[in-house]
Amino acid sequence: MRSGGRGRPRLPVGERSLLERPSPPKRRLIPRAQLLPQLLLALTVALVFYTIWSSWHSQTEELPLGRELRGPLIGSLPEARVRRVVGQLDPHRLWNTFLRPLLVVRTPGSPGNLQVRKFLEATLRTLSAGWHIELDSFTASTPLGPLDFGNVVATLDPGAARHLTLACHYDSKLFPSGSAPFVGATDSAVPCSLLLELAQALDQELGKAKERAAPVTLQLLFLDGEEALKEWGPKDSLYGSQHLAQLMESTPHGLGSTRIQAIELFMLLDLLGAPNPTFYSHFPRTARWFHRLRSIEKRLHRLNLLQSHPWEVMYFQTGEPPISVEDDHIPFLRRD
């Protein structure tokens, strides 16, 4: 992993409105065309969630927590519904409204970090679905001394028995003093903007699901402190996910369970934004969900709903993953 640099003093955020776009440093932006493959990922996540809550609402009211859900519950959406979902996603809104405000230096404890955190909270609070927003604030020992961190946790219906949890990190990598400003577009502003676009595009549908008390709900995690501050290692990385996973493990949820046990499926989005991304299945337990995403990609291709997509399957690849990945999923995986 990359090595970092010296920390920056924490300064008060100015008088700028939380929803006003910050003035980022000069940089080369990602071409919009390169974001279209990432919008596919938002599409697939949206479609999987539609499938889950539509099927589970009618079939799993009495299913005990902890019991895995099997293939018969994974249905297929009608073509008209697929096209409607695709039509609700807006790449221009993704770019201008959600991504641009995130393209600032946002290392832990910096003014940009706090500003982005408040932007995430404020944006989620504007949605009509009525998300329950929590801030997991904590101070951790780091190679640079004690630093303040904050995870943003958005849960559509906190009372639902199960959570489909989508996660990303919003902090950017710290580089030595004098380096060019690093805003971490792919690492990981784009994933954060994808989750915001997903929540906005499905705002009405998610609100309806919440009203009828569907047994599975959507949860979004915006994690702080993923990046190492000096050198990647177990004591210098994943600050936010380690703290939140520990907190969820010790927090009751329903009868005889904890918040981490309520997570039925955990999907981490990171390092997205470059052209032609590829994804591999890393865990046998979630292989069926990976193949579901692969099937959705094929279906979107056959329906001619994808741009710059000459082959039936480009992104969700079969075979062994080329490398193992240490990322924010690890603290949750260890407690599963």
What role is predicted for each listed range?
Residues 1-336:
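Secretory-pathway/membrane protein signature
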